[in-house]
Amino acid sequence: MRAIGLMSGTSMDGIDAALIETDGETVAWLGSALTIPYGAETRALLEGAMADARGVNARTDRPGRLVEAERRITTLHGAAVRALLDSLRLTPADIDVVGFHGQTVLHRPDAALTVQIGLGQALADDLRIPVVADLRAADVAAGGQGAPLVPVFHQALVRGLDLPQPVAVLNIGGVANVTVLEDGADPIACDTGPGNALLDDFMAARTGRPYDDDGASAARGQVDEAAVAEVLGHPFFAAPPPKSLDRNEFRAFVTERLHLAGASTDDGAATLTALSAASIAAVVPLLPKAPKSWIVAGGGARNSTLRAMLAERLGVPVVVAEQVGWSADALEAHAFGFLAVRSLKGLALTFPTTTGAPEPLTGGVLFQPTP
């Protein structure tokens, strides 16, 4: 089947749209992708919506700016699909399904609550293409973490690679997550801790720029290793997989312990980057076997300082997704196209070893265009 996957991650920097050909079990090819960046107004709206979501107690609650944000991102996701189709000279009739993640505004698996805004029916009607959305809800309702969702996709991709195993596929978005894969074993997965979110927010506040471009600021700074070690004392980092995080889970905890207010921009960036690397490395002792190969995707893959810190702490080769024929920027969008096809076929999206679900579970809600 030919699917388009859509992803707007916790970094809130834009929408990734990617074409994929798959039967939901194997990947025939990873097609073209594009990114539609969010403007400053949309990003501010999403940040406000995320703040308003803190008081949400049910998945359908839409207080404050959530209603406007949901409409806005649905419209923008439709525009992203059309832009991708136009770039490939395709029409909606050429696409079997769209996988629509939406925007996570609240993730509290401890309260059996995860909220992704986005109007699946409106998107299906706009595009005239079937849409699968709400991909996390069934897992959380069954007692799972609802994240990460992508391990089954990583498993399909890694089957075609000749790398020393176990292989870790690391996505560094706003939150970082890892999938650990070995032939004959169920995938193991979890969120590892802060990815880019805290660093991006720090850079935006200090410089007005949305991120530390290629880790240039961090490369000039000095890491406060004692402060990083103090943050790693949080119980989350000692908990075994599966486990997951909300984007803002550590904001107050980290800010207080890293003493960022008194740090220079470069030193703050260096320490936050080191925290991301150290929290990823901290998952290794919690695994049955240490990964022998690491493949890095997501926005963090574009940060050479973070990659260097990660390689130093892991002590094994770290390669970016492009080095194995994938796209670091589009990997999660490709994943949601893959997951949409699995959902259509009733195949499992989540597993006890990836989200803590009680059994392998399918998920997602299908929205057909209104006749």
Curated annotation (Swiss-Prot):
Function in brief: Catalyzes the specific phosphorylation of 1,6-anhydro-N-acetylmuramic acid (anhMurNAc) with the simultaneous cleavage of the 1,6-anhydro ring, generating MurNAc-6-P. Is required for the utilization of anhMurNAc either imported from the medium or derived from its own cell wall murein, and thus plays a role in cell wall recycling.
Coiled-coil stretches: none
Family: Belongs to the anhydro-N-acetylmuramic acid kinase family.
Residue positions binding ATP: 9-16
Catalysed reaction, written as an equation: 1,6-anhydro-N-acetyl-beta-muramate + ATP + H2O = N-acetyl-D-muramate 6-phosphate + ADP + H(+)
EC number(s) reported in the record: 2.7.1.170
Disulphide bonds in the chain: none
Organism: Azorhizobium caulinodans (strain ATCC 43989 / DSM 5975 / JCM 20966 / LMG 6465 / NBRC 14845 / NCIMB 13405 / ORS 571)
Keyword RNA-binding: no
Protein name, per record: Anhydro-N-acetylmuramic acid kinase
Main enzyme class: transferase
Pathway where it operates: Amino-sugar metabolism; 1,6-anhydro-N-acetylmuramate degradation; Cell wall biogenesis; peptidoglycan recycling
One GO-annotated biological process of the protein: 1,6-anhydro-N-acetyl-beta-muramic acid catabolic process
A Pfam family this chain is assigned to: AnmK
Gene Ontology molecular function: ATP binding; kinase activity; phosphotransferase activity, alcohol group as acceptor
Top-level division of the source organism's lineage: Bacteria
Keyword vocabulary terms for this entry: ATP-binding, Carbohydrate metabolism, Kinase, Nucleotide-binding, Transferase
